[in-house]
């Protein structure tokens, strides 16, 4: 390390003694030794994984930043369309990355997490970037202020910031690191450690480079930008659009900073349309002043290995971050919003492993107490912060007033339609919520607006046993457009696989509240009305609120969700053991590449469609159309089949008057319980039933009527349960029985209607 003139000299003996002492002293209890070697496994503190939040854990200061918030200064005072597809989710910042995606990935200066530790040798710092395609694309500055500096002036490495004053500035890229004091004296530090797999850059800062800092209360600030190879400082952001080598959107004298950390109080101004957690940041950068975006703490807590008692506050909105198991690369895919994918496409847009989702904890949330959960899908061209930015009253009425957690996945993009990568992201975010918060799986509901309404149909009808209610708002029944009696548009592999009208059959035990407007310019009323008619024809429990005067955006801007709150309270819990189950299986709707097969619900699963099989080649329309179905009734509950009751009334509002029609499912009356079931099968060659959930006693003789409507053929029936040794007959003729660890398997040949009897030996 070399110091410029004016620094305090130290003897070689003193330096050697300090190094030896540091080497032989153990780290304090709770602390972990660190070294900037690129091996990030020595960073072991527990992060909040909540954007903007900071804590100390095991002697590490850990700050989690907002993801995809790296848009620099708001110089023009208004929202701006991002470089990527996001027509309804503008940024406040104006900066845009160089178009060389192989180097910058449209996301190169996005700080994901900062960690700082301390020991007898000095400070240890690691910055995790959301995207790191090139180790020398980003540059990071950590400013440290103990309140001693009285020097004003610009930050030292081209950041373009004037305040706050700080004692020291630690600036580093993937290849070099320096520390500069408030008087401009600069020392070169050891080469940073880089871990490209973890997008991490580490740097060690000895106390000798930070005089009179150790053990003090300090305020830290962290900013990021793009490295200028010529100056080894911040690349300036010129006016105009970006080029392959240079960013754009700046102005003469504007800051070179794209992202700022330590912002726990980010706002989402409804009138402005801020969706990315960078409104305060972008305003501060326009003023070249980040003095309000810092974190003050006692450095001695790091050396002492302190762990604080951080817990998220209830009654507020967060962006939570989780690490996906999916490998899509890193960076942002721009996804051209014109041409063949004008309505969107299933390919992921946000590629990096760490993904955010919106999370609201209700005012009365108590960790450890099972809490209702609401999955709330976002619209096309908007993100996971949509409801915080546009309709925050949703969190009051569907969160606080129901004591419910609400979460909104990003779904890997603004236009993925929850079909492939977006569907998987929902499931991963859902698992993260359940893993870290106290949720009640029996009181889980699903809703969403526009494309999120489509998600409500799709996920709700593929997995109806996961939810208590489903409430699509202005959701198209099909991926992307349906004008009946015509086919959904555009044509292609999702014309069948993306059409939820095909699986309304599955909603027998999932009450739907459907909401659509009569003058909707994006989701035509004809498709919504046809979807509701299918619910009526099948007798599914539902209400269809039809608002004659409402356009596509009227309901979300009105921000009134009272009747949906009441709907969820009317059906607070799912019924996992219904008397009747209906399920239609489309193999083309599976996601075999992700290990996801939708082959039943409740006490039915293992459905195998007779032909053409369980996986479809692209363009194989016959395979896309193939489906099989079951309608089953257990006699063991002692109830007859349910009946349908029509519902119709005029709803006065709020927010607008609506014509409401629907059907209630009236439970069947009591009958003598018998140990058996009835199953009506179409185009299936196998099915499995869970007899315990059906109320059937496997130790007693079991009777079943099996009816096929497609000509029949070989059929495998699996009955899951604790069966003793049994024999079986079909229409009085013996059939072979295979005893398995799960229960019994019966190989049958079905033609019309049959009587199956299973008898314990």
Region annotations inferred by a language model:
Residues 32-176, 225-233:
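Surface-exposed, glycine/proline- and aromatic-rich loop segments on solvent-exposed faces
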Residues 32-51, 143, 147-169, 209-296:
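Acidic/polar low-complexity flexible segments
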Residues 38, 121-131, 201-206, 677-681, ...:
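Short, well-ordered beta-strand segments enriched in hydrophobic/aromatic residues
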Residues 259-356, 360-361, 537-542, 548-761:
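Alpha/beta-hydrolase-fold serine-hydrolase catalytic core, especially in secreted/extracellular enzymes
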Residues 363-369, 416-451, 461-467, 506:
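Gly/Ser-rich "nucleophile elbow"/oxyanion-hole loop immediately N-terminal to the catalytic nucleophile
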Residues 370-436:
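Active-site machinery of serine-nucleophile hydrolases
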Residues 382, 442-503:
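Primarily recognizes the serine-hydrolase "nucleophile elbow" in alpha/beta-hydrolase
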Residues 480-481, 485-569:
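The feature captures the conserved acid-bearing segment of alpha/beta-hydrolase catalytic domains
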């Amino acid at each position: 390390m070399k110091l410029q003139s004016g620094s305090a000299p130290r003897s070689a003996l003193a330096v050697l003694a300090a190094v030896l002492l540091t080497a032989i002293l153990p780290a304090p209890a709770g602390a972990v030794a660190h070294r900037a070697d690129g091996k990030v496994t020595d960073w072991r503190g527990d992060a909040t994984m909540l954007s903007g939040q900071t804590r100390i854990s095991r002697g590490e200061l850990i700050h989690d930043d907002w993801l995809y918030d790296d848009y620099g200064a708001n110089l023009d005072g208004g929202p701006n369309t991002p470089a990527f597809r996001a027509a309804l989710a503008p940024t406040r910042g104006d900066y845009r990355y160089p178009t060389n995606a192989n180097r910058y990935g449209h996301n190169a200066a996005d700080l994901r997490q900062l960690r700082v530790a301390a020991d007898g040798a000095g400070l240890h710092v690691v910055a995790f970037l959301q995207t790191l395609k090139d180790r020398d694309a980003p540059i990071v500055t950590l400013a440290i202020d103990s309140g001693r500096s009285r020097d004003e002036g610009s930050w030292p490495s081209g950041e373009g910031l004037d305040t706050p004053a700080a004692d020291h500035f630690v600036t580093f890229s993937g290849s070099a690191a320096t520390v500069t004091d408030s008087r401009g004296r600069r020392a070169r530090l050891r080469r940073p450690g880089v871990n490209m797999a973890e997008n991490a850059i580490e740097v060690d800062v000895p106390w000798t480079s930070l005089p009179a800092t150790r053990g003090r209360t300090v305020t830290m600030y962290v900013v990021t930008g793009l490295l200028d190879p010529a100056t080894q400082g911040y690349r300036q952001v010129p006016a105009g659009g970006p080029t392959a080598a240079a960013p754009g959107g700046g102005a003469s004298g504007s800051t070179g900073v794209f992202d700022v950390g330590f912002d726990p109080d980010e706002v989402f101004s409804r009138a402005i349309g801020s969706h990315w957690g960078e409104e305060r940041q972008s305003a501060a950068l326009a003023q070249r002043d980040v003095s309000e975006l810092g974190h003050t703490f006692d450095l001695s807590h790091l050396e002492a290995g302190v762990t604080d008692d951080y817990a998220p506050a209830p009654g507020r909105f967060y962006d939570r971050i989780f690490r996906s198991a999916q490998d899509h690369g890193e960076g942002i895919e721009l996804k051209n919003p014109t041409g063949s994918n004008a309505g969107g496409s299933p390919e992921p847009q946000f590629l990096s492993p760490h993904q955010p989702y919106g999370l609201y904890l209700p005012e009365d949330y108590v960790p450890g107490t099972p809490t209702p959960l609401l999955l709330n899908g976002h619209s096309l061209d908007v993100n996971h912060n949509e409801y915080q930015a546009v309709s925050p009253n949703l969190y009051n009425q569907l969160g606080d007033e129901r004591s419910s957690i609400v979460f909104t996945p990003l779904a890997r993009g603004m236009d993925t339609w929850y079909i492939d990568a977006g569907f998987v992201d929902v499931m991963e975010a859902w698992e993260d919520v359940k893993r870290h918060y106290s949720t009640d799986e029996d009181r889980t509901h699903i809703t969403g607006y526009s494309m999120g309404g489509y998600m409500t149909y799709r996920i709700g009808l593929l997995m109806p046993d996961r939810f208590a209610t489903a409430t699509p708002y202005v959701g198209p029944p099909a991926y992307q457009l349906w004008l009946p009696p015509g086919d959904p548009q555009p044509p292609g592999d999702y014309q069948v696989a993306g059409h939820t009208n095909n699986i309304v059959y599955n909603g027998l035990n999932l009450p739907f509240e459907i909401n659509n407007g009569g003058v909707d310019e994006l989701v035509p009323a004809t498709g919504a009305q046809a979807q509701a008619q299918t619910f009526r024809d099948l007798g599914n429990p539902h209400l269809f609120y039809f608002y004659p005067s409402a356009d596509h955006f009227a309901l979300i801007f009105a921000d009134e969700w009272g009747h949906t709150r009441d709907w969820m309270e009317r059906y607070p819990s799912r019924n996992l053991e219904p008397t009747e189950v209906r399920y239609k299986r489309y193999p083309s709707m599976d996601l075999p590449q992700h290990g996801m097969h939708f082959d039943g619900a409740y006490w039915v699963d293992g459905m195998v469609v007779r032909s053409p099989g369980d996986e479809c080649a692209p363009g194989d329309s016959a395979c896309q159309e193939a489906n099989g179905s079951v309608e089953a009734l257990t006699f063991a509950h002692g109830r007859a089949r349910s009946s349908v009751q029509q519902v119709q009334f005029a709803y006065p509002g709020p927010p607008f008057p609506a014509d409401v029609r629907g059907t209630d499912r009236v439970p069947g009356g009591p009958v003598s319980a018998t140990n058996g079931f009835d199953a009506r099968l179409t185009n299936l060659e196998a099915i499995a039933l869970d007899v315990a959930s059906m109320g059937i006693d496997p130790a007693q003789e079991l009777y079943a009527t099996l009816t096929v409507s497609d000509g029949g053929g070989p059929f495998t029936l699996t009955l899951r349960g604790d069966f003793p040794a049994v024999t079986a007959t079909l229409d009085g003729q013996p059939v072979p029985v295979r005893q398995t660890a799960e229960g019994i398997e019966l190989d049958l040949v079905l033609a019309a209607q049959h009587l199956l009897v299973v008898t314990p030996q």
